Design a protein with these regions (language model features):
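Long C-terminal interaction/binding lobes of large macromolecular proteins
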Residues: 224
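RNA pseudouridine synthases
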Residues: 1-193, 197-199, 298-307, 311-312, ...
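Short, surface-exposed secondary-structure edge patches
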Residues: 49-53, 237, 276
Length: 328
């Protein structure tokens, strides 16, 4: 369940109702939207009401239903379209773009951009069908997500039937998802099959951690292959068999090689202190409606990867790791 944390600054001089404070901040929402969207509200780790009083130093956590709002405004935001037909749009999402509107990000999301794009291409083919009627039949069917700072492939459905068809493939784990990443540190082996439980970190609820000695949390499996190394850095390909929140980031930390630029799970690197998250969804293999065979989509590797690799090649000799038999 998505959540957002708000720490009340020391500059707040008086106590105020929780809902009034949330409405006053830039990423906030009014009481009616908060009441209809929020699934749970925590104040300093304990359940709270909208009428609860808050003061400086308090920490509010709002957990909301993972549903896409219906009142989304189309926005003219450039998109990198990989593939499109009457049922789907496949996009190479940019790093820094949120997938869909939610608390803290009501605009400039992928869904806002898609609605504008679909509006442009919704040209009536029949005289008795209006553009608005075409748009009403199209809804932002988000069947999987990428973290805000993760770039790469996202497939979206244009109608309910396609959304259900694609969602069932993700649910049954029939979709192949492959990522490319640059890490600080080397994996313990040239390849491996990581199987753990992923649980929320009790000390920092924004984070998750991987555990093997518990049945709590959710099972997660990631298959990795180290492509090459440059000194203490490594280029890794990961195929995930499950789709847990922060899964690759958590599993890489578990292996002792945090993803470069991951501000949540690692400290800034001395050689790359300001680099963005070096995690990219490279490949997606899935069946499309009406097609018998699986379709393989690939997203171009972004320039930030080549910039980092260029610096690494100047400083360290390249070590190519041995090829291994693919783990199923």
């Amino acid at each position: 369940m998505p959540s957002i944390f708000v720490k009340i600054p020391e500059t707040l001089c008086e106590t105020i109702r929780l809902d009034q404070y949330i409405a006053s901040i830039p990423q906030g929402m009014n009481r009616s939207k908060l009441k209809s969207t929020a699934q749970e509200i925590l104040l300093n780790g304990k359940n709270a009401k909208l009428s609860s009083k808050v003061k400086k130093g308090d920490v509010i956590e709002i957990l909301w239903e993972d549903n896409i709002p219906t009142d989304i405004e189309p926005e003219n935001i450039p998109l990198k379209i990989i593939y499109e037909d009457e049922n789907v749009t496949v996009v190479n999402k940019a790093s820094g773009m949120v997938t869909h509107p939610a608390l803290g990000n009501w605009s400039k999301t992928l869904v806002n951009a898609l609605l504008y794009h679909w509006k442009k291409e919704a040209v009536p083919q029949k005289k008795d069908v209006s553009q608005n009627e075409i748009l009403k039949s199209r809804r932002p069917g988000i069947v999987h997500r990428l973290d805000k700072d993760t770039s790469g492939i996202i497939i979206t459905a244009k109608n309910r039937e396609t959304e259900e068809y694609l969602s069932s493939q993700f649910k049954e784990r029939l979709v192949q998802k492959e990522y490319i990443l640059i890490c600080k540190g080397r994996p313990p082996a040239s390849s491996g099959d990581v199987k753990t439980q992923i649980v929320r970190d009790s000390k920092n609820r924004k984070k998750f951690k991987a555990l093997t000695d518990t049945t709590d949390g959710k099972f997660a499996r990631s298959i990795y292959h180290c492509i090459s190394c440059y000194g203490p850095y490594s280029v890794v390909r990961v195929r995930i068999k499950t789709g847990r929140t922060h899964q690759i980031r958590v599993h890489m930390k578990y292996l002792g090689c945090q993803i470069l630029g991951d501000k949540l799970y690692s400290k800034p690197d001395e050689n790359f202190p300001n680099v963005p998250l070096m995690l990219h969804s490279r490949k997606l293999v899935i069946k499309l409606p009406g097609k018998e065979k699986y379709h393989c989509f690939k997203a171009q590797i972004p320039s930030r990867f080549y910039e980092v690799l260029k610096k690494l090649k100047k400083k360290y000799p390249k070590e190519v790791m041995p090829r291994v038999k693919c783990i199923r």
